[in-house]
Amino acid sequence: FCTGGRGTSGGVYRVVYKGEIPERVKNLGSGVAAAIRQPQLESAWARQEIASIRRQLGDQWGQLVAGVAFSNDNPSHYRTRAMDLMQLFGPVPSEDLVIELSEAPSETVRAKAAWMMGLHPDAKSRERLIEMLRDRDARVQRAVCEAMLRSGQLPSDPSDILPLLADEDRTLAFVARRVLERMPVDKWRKQVLGHLDSRVGILGMLALVNADPSEETCLEVLARSSELMTEFLSDADFVDTLRLCQVALHRGQIDPSRVTALRDQIAEEFPAGDNRMNHELIRLAAYLQADSIADRALDYLSSDNPEPDRTLAAMCLQFLSHDWNAEQRFEILKYYESAANNTSSSSLAMYLMNVTRDFGKSLSDEDVTAILEQGAVWRNAALAAIYKLPRPIDEE
């Protein structure tokens, strides 16, 4: 491996094991057993070793490797290694044999069988993959969804895939959503918009926005999301609903004036008792121009909430069209200066400098004069105020 990069010194290193090599590693056995136990299958040298074993075994290779794969008495990692060898070195198992492997007691073997069906799609394998969506193991269900995405063998009935959206395994829910996005939208649009399970509805509507990001669709999703937020939702689901609104607003290029009811609803929620909610609420409020949160946002800046959360809120305030009075403008600028001076991150200090400069565009002439008089204390604000001075600058 190597180190260095980006103008730093580095080097090339090799790691060598100097301990005693276990007997099971030194003695891999002979014949097909050595091929099954061969370490580092993905390396070139390991594949060369296996290719040599295959040449030695000749016509017996296929039967011996298949025997390892299909025997329930073998450990699952031996069986899946045998399936890998059949894929890499042949003979590739027939569709019937792969379907038989998909019914094995071992979850690992069933998942590997689903992987192989994704590589070699056929009519029977498509039906079997749809059946395996109801497997009792999440790893198998994930492998099935990935195989469907790879091969295009999608289910025709959305009800086969929708329950997986609510699974606790986030990776499974993700790949299931990707499968749903590939299916014809007209088959599942109404189901996700009206689904009783909020989790299925949230992820289903995210799939809908990705599959059909039209303005009409995004407005429907925003309307349904607004309804969901009036019902009981867990904190995690509420946060995801807010994020769904952000995606819908962005993908549909929705003008804030089209969703004034959502704007007012978001404004009423801020500040929430959960910091994750506040992160999403302040972003939405800034985009939707929810000026009614201005006073509460200023109170939030002076609260005892974590500084990163307050800084995010302060950085979003610059996007509000609220007509700040002089006292409020100075309070916001004071926070920018304080956060920039207190942070140990040079990057954040530079971000806050840019935010101060942008916010300074709203300063009045009186504000500019007052800030420049205190330039030694309010350095970033003074720099922003300079941009407001008339050109050329006179001595006064």
Roles of regions detected by a PLM:
Residues 2-11, 15-396:
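Long, ordered, helix-rich scaffold segments
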